[in-house]
Amino acid sequence: MANADVSVTIARPVEDVFAVLTDPTLAPRWAANAIKGELLTPGPPGVGSRRRAVVKGFFGGTMESVMEVTELEPNRTLALRLISASWGGSGRTKYTLTPVPGGTRVDWRWEMEPGGVMKPFDRPLMAVFRRAFQRDVNNLKAMMESNAL
Protein backbone atom coordinates (compact mmCIF):
# COMPACT_ATOMS: atom_id res chain seq x y z
CA MET A 1 0.00 0.00 0.00
CA ALA A 2 1.38 3.40 -0.98
CA ASN A 3 0.76 6.58 0.97
CA ALA A 4 0.75 10.34 0.55
CA ASP A 5 1.17 12.80 3.41
CA VAL A 6 0.47 16.52 3.12
CA SER A 7 0.18 19.31 5.67
CA VAL A 8 -0.91 22.91 5.91
CA THR A 9 -1.46 25.48 8.64
CA ILE A 10 -4.69 27.46 8.35
CA ALA A 11 -5.22 30.73 10.21
CA ARG A 12 -8.66 29.71 11.47
CA PRO A 13 -9.86 28.01 14.67
CA VAL A 14 -9.74 24.23 14.73
CA GLU A 15 -13.56 24.09 15.06
CA ASP A 16 -14.00 25.91 11.74
CA VAL A 17 -11.53 23.68 9.90
CA PHE A 18 -13.06 20.52 11.35
CA ALA A 19 -16.55 21.64 10.29
CA VAL A 20 -15.41 22.05 6.68
CA LEU A 21 -13.55 18.72 6.56
CA THR A 22 -16.50 16.78 7.99
CA ASP A 23 -18.92 18.23 5.41
CA PRO A 24 -18.39 16.35 2.13
CA THR A 25 -20.73 18.71 0.27
CA LEU A 26 -18.03 21.42 0.60
CA ALA A 27 -15.24 19.34 -0.98
CA PRO A 28 -15.99 20.47 -4.57
CA ARG A 29 -15.29 24.04 -3.47
CA TRP A 30 -11.73 23.37 -2.29
CA ALA A 31 -10.63 20.06 -3.87
CA ALA A 32 -9.85 20.53 -7.57
CA ASN A 33 -10.94 17.08 -8.77
CA ALA A 34 -14.07 16.81 -6.60
CA ILE A 35 -17.33 17.11 -8.52
CA LYS A 36 -19.82 16.10 -5.84
CA GLY A 37 -19.77 15.03 -2.21
CA GLU A 38 -22.73 13.85 -0.16
CA LEU A 39 -23.59 12.23 3.14
CA LEU A 40 -25.28 8.84 2.75
CA THR A 41 -26.09 8.42 6.43
CA PRO A 42 -28.65 10.74 8.05
CA GLY A 43 -27.62 12.89 10.98
CA PRO A 44 -24.27 14.33 11.96
CA PRO A 45 -21.16 12.42 10.91
CA GLY A 46 -19.96 9.76 13.31
CA VAL A 47 -18.19 6.40 13.34
CA GLY A 48 -19.99 4.18 10.83
CA SER A 49 -21.50 7.03 8.81
CA ARG A 50 -20.92 6.95 5.08
CA ARG A 51 -20.28 9.49 2.35
CA ARG A 52 -20.10 9.34 -1.42
CA ALA A 53 -17.74 11.29 -3.67
CA VAL A 54 -17.69 11.79 -7.42
CA VAL A 55 -14.35 12.98 -8.80
CA LYS A 56 -12.80 13.63 -12.20
CA GLY A 57 -11.31 10.49 -13.74
CA PHE A 58 -7.76 10.07 -15.04
CA PHE A 59 -8.69 9.88 -18.71
CA GLY A 60 -11.91 11.87 -18.71
CA GLY A 61 -15.19 10.74 -17.25
CA THR A 62 -15.75 10.36 -13.53
CA MET A 63 -14.96 7.98 -10.69
CA GLU A 64 -17.17 7.33 -7.70
CA SER A 65 -16.35 6.09 -4.21
CA VAL A 66 -18.09 5.42 -0.92
CA MET A 67 -16.18 5.90 2.33
CA GLU A 68 -17.07 5.05 5.92
CA VAL A 69 -15.97 7.02 8.98
CA THR A 70 -13.75 4.79 11.15
CA GLU A 71 -12.59 7.39 13.66
CA LEU A 72 -14.02 10.74 14.64
CA GLU A 73 -12.77 12.83 17.52
CA PRO A 74 -14.39 16.28 17.28
CA ASN A 75 -11.96 19.03 16.35
CA ARG A 76 -9.08 16.55 16.30
CA THR A 77 -9.41 13.52 13.98
CA LEU A 78 -11.43 12.31 11.01
CA ALA A 79 -10.51 8.94 9.51
CA LEU A 80 -12.32 7.08 6.74
CA ARG A 81 -11.91 3.84 4.85
CA LEU A 82 -12.85 3.12 1.28
CA ILE A 83 -15.91 0.86 1.09
CA SER A 84 -16.30 0.80 -2.68
CA ALA A 85 -14.75 2.56 -5.62
CA SER A 86 -15.49 2.47 -9.33
CA TRP A 87 -11.72 2.24 -9.94
CA GLY A 88 -11.23 -0.77 -7.65
CA GLY A 89 -8.61 -1.01 -4.97
CA SER A 90 -8.65 -0.18 -1.30
CA GLY A 91 -7.66 2.76 0.81
CA ARG A 92 -8.07 4.89 3.87
CA THR A 93 -7.52 8.52 4.74
CA LYS A 94 -7.03 10.46 7.94
CA TYR A 95 -7.11 14.14 8.82
CA THR A 96 -5.42 15.13 12.07
CA LEU A 97 -6.01 18.67 13.31
CA THR A 98 -3.76 20.35 15.84
CA PRO A 99 -4.36 23.79 17.36
CA VAL A 100 -1.28 25.98 16.87
CA PRO A 101 -0.69 29.65 17.68
CA GLY A 102 -2.83 31.62 15.25
CA GLY A 103 -4.66 28.69 13.69
CA THR A 104 -4.85 24.99 12.94
CA ARG A 105 -2.33 22.56 11.51
CA VAL A 106 -3.91 19.94 9.23
CA ASP A 107 -2.01 16.71 8.56
CA TRP A 108 -3.68 14.61 5.85
CA ARG A 109 -2.63 11.05 5.08
CA TRP A 110 -3.93 8.87 2.24
CA GLU A 111 -3.05 5.16 2.05
CA MET A 112 -4.15 3.46 -1.13
CA GLU A 113 -3.71 0.23 -3.01
CA PRO A 114 -5.02 0.53 -6.57
CA GLY A 115 -6.77 -2.49 -8.03
CA GLY A 116 -6.69 -4.19 -11.40
CA VAL A 117 -4.32 -2.93 -14.07
CA MET A 118 -3.41 0.09 -11.93
CA LYS A 119 -1.92 -2.04 -9.12
CA PRO A 120 1.69 -1.96 -10.43
CA PHE A 121 1.56 1.83 -10.54
CA ASP A 122 0.65 2.48 -6.90
CA ARG A 123 3.81 4.42 -5.99
CA PRO A 124 3.92 6.65 -9.10
CA LEU A 125 0.19 7.30 -8.69
CA MET A 126 0.65 8.35 -5.09
CA ALA A 127 3.36 10.83 -6.14
CA VAL A 128 0.80 12.41 -8.49
CA PHE A 129 -1.87 12.30 -5.77
CA ARG A 130 0.50 13.84 -3.21
CA ARG A 131 0.99 16.89 -5.44
CA ALA A 132 -2.76 17.13 -6.07
CA PHE A 133 -3.59 16.77 -2.35
CA GLN A 134 -1.05 19.47 -1.45
CA ARG A 135 -2.68 21.81 -3.98
CA ASP A 136 -6.05 20.96 -2.45
CA VAL A 137 -5.02 21.76 1.14
CA ASN A 138 -3.34 24.95 -0.06
CA ASN A 139 -6.63 25.89 -1.73
CA LEU A 140 -8.52 24.97 1.46
CA LYS A 141 -6.18 27.29 3.38
CA ALA A 142 -6.65 30.17 0.93
CA MET A 143 -10.43 29.80 0.90
CA MET A 144 -10.77 29.49 4.67
CA GLU A 145 -8.43 32.38 5.38
CA SER A 146 -10.39 34.61 2.96
CA ASN A 147 -13.68 33.47 4.58
CA ALA A 148 -14.84 31.90 1.29
CA LEU A 149 -15.50 28.74 3.34
Can you say where each PLM-predicted feature lies in the sequence?
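Hydrophobic ligand-binding cavity/cleft-lining segments
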Residues: 1-41, 46-47
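Hydrophobic/aromatic beta-strand elements that line small-molecule binding cavities or substrate pockets
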Residues: 6-8, 39, 64-71, 91-99
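Generic recognition of short, well-ordered alpha-helical interface segments
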Residues: 12, 29, 64, 131-135
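Amphipathic alpha-helical segments that line or abut small-molecule/effector binding pockets
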Residues: 15-18, 134, 138
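Alpha-helix N-cap/helix-start motif
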Residues: 30, 62-63, 90, 118
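Glycine-rich portal/gate segments that line the openings of hydrophobic small-molecule binding cavities
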Residues: 38-86, 105, 112, 135-149
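Beta-strand/loop substructures that line and gate deep hydrophobic ligand-binding cavities in soluble
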Residues: 81-135, 142
